[in-house]
A protein has these predicted regions:
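A cross-family signal for N-terminal binding/gating loops and helix N-caps
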Residues: 1-177
C-alpha cells in the first residue's frame, strides 16, 4: 500500500505531502518529480540496491481493480499489464488520445530521456475480455478506495491465452501526456 501512487497528473501538493512520507520507495518519487535528473539518480540507486529489479523471465500481469464510480456504484475492471510493440504513428495499431497538451508531453519526454524508462504504465483500452484471474494475487494494494490486485503469468502458453482476448487496435486512455 505504501508504494503505490495515483497517476502523476492528478497528484497535487497535498497528495505529495501525504504520499512521500509513506515510504522511501513510493512510486511517486520516480514519476512525480519535476527534477528529472534526481529521478534518474534515484532509479539508479534503487537498481543498484536491489529495490527495483528486472524480472529475469518475460511475464504478463493480470490486473483487477475494485472501486466506486462517480455515480456511487461499485465497479470492477480487469486488464492486462504487458509491453506492446512500437508501430509507426498512424498504422492503426494504437489509436491516439483525442487531445494532449504540449507542456505535459514535454515533461514526460524529459523524464523518459533522463531515466530511460517510463515509470508508470500507459492505460489503454481494447475490445475483448481480460481473463479472470485464478489463485491468490502476487500483489495487492489499496489507495484512495481503489483495491488493486496483480497476478503474474510467467508461462508463455498461459500468457498467450491471456493476450488472446485483446482484439483490434488499442486506444490510449491515459498516461501518455
Amino acid at each position: 500500500d505504501d508504494l503505490v501512487a495515483p497517476p502523476y497528473d492528478v497528484i497535487d501538493p497535498e497528495d505529495l505531502d501525504r504520499l512521500l512520507p509513506r515510504s522511501p520507495w513510493t512510486a511517486v518519487r520516480l514519476d512525480g518529480p519535476d527534477d528529472t535528473e534526481k529521478a534518474a539518480r534515484l532509479l539508479g540507486e534503487w537498481q543498484d540496491e536491489g529495490v527495483l529489479v528486472r524480472d529475469e523471465r518475460p511475464a504478463v500481469w493480470l490486473l483487477e481493480e475494485d472501486f466506486t464510480g462517480p455515480d456511487g456504484v461499485p465497479r470492477r475492471r480487469r486488464g492486462i499489464v504487458a509491453r506492446v510493440r512500437l508501430d509507426p504513428y498512424g498504422s492503426g495499431a494504437v489509436l491516439p488520445h483525442e487531445r494532449t497538451f504540449s507542456g505535459p508531453k514535454e515533461a514526460r519526454l524529459r523524464l523518459l530521456r533522463a531515466t530511460r524508462t517510463k515509470p508508470s504504465p500507459i492505460f489503454m483500452l481494447h475490445h475483448g475480455t481480460a481473463p479472470s484471474p485464478t489463485g491468490e494475487p502476487a500483489l495487492q494494494a489499496e489507495l484512495d478506495g481503489v483495491v488493486s490486485r496483480l497476478w503474474r503469468i510467467g508461462d508463455p502458453a498461459e500468457a498467450e491465452r491471456a493476450l488472446a482476448g485483446a482484439e483490434g487496435p488499442l486506444l490510449i486512455a491515459d498516461g501518455h501526456h
